[in-house]
């Protein structure tokens, strides 16, 4: 059975900017394809922001074009404007990597309960309703029909695999990573405690 992973990058800056990303990865032989990672920027006032990604893998797609990094003007509502005057809702990238994730702790959730679980879990991890909605509408169709989903939030490993360098630097940084795979039967695993810093 293929392993399915959903990754969530999340970083918050109370004084300068707030950064949030949504992504996923799927194992293909020795590599995993990281799907739909996005980075949101929310400064307190309009700010020029540079974002670089040190990814322990190979980038396969970026939008806007990554080049040597992203350089945008970010507004408090999250609107990003690049050097060519184009506007975006977020920064997007995809890639392949061979990271290994631990699913020994987390949650076993019935497929039919996945939407409600994600609403609560993503709220507890500090996402806004808009950010959680973006995450859920992308992943729910792949999860809700499974008998069960094994879900584990793992920020430490993902922080090492996909390091973000943001300038100006955030005051607070929170990385959230959700790994998951479908199950035919329910399993008992130790539950995780989900917390988030103030934003």
Question: Can you say where each PLM-predicted feature lies in the sequence?
Answer:
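Bacterial N-terminal signal peptides that target proteins for export
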Residues: 2-10
């Amino acid at each position: 059975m293929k392993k399915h992973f959903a990754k969530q990058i999340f970083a918050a800056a109370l004084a300068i900017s707030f950064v949030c990303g949504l992504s996923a990865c799927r194992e293909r032989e020795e590599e995993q394809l990281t799907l739909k990672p996005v980075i949101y920027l929310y400064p307190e006032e309009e700010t020029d922001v540079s974002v670089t990604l040190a990814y322990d893998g190979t980038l396969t797609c970026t939008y806007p074009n990554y080049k040597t990094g992203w350089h945008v003007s970010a507004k408090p509502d999250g609107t990003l404007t690049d050097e060519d005057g184009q506007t975006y809702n977020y920064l997007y990238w995809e890639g392949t990597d061979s990271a290994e994730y631990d699913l020994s702790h987390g949650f076993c959730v019935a497929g039919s309960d996945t939407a409600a679980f994600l609403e609560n879990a993503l709220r507890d991890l500090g996402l806004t309703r808009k950010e959680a909605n973006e995450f859920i509408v992308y992943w729910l169709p792949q999860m809700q029909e499974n008998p069960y989903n094994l879900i584990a939030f793992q920020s430490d490993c993902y922080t090492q695999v996909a390091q973000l360098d943001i300038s100006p630097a955030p005051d607070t940084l929170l990385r959230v990573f959700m790994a998951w795979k479908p199950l035919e039967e329910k399993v008992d695993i130790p539950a995780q405690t989900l917390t988030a810093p103030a934003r």
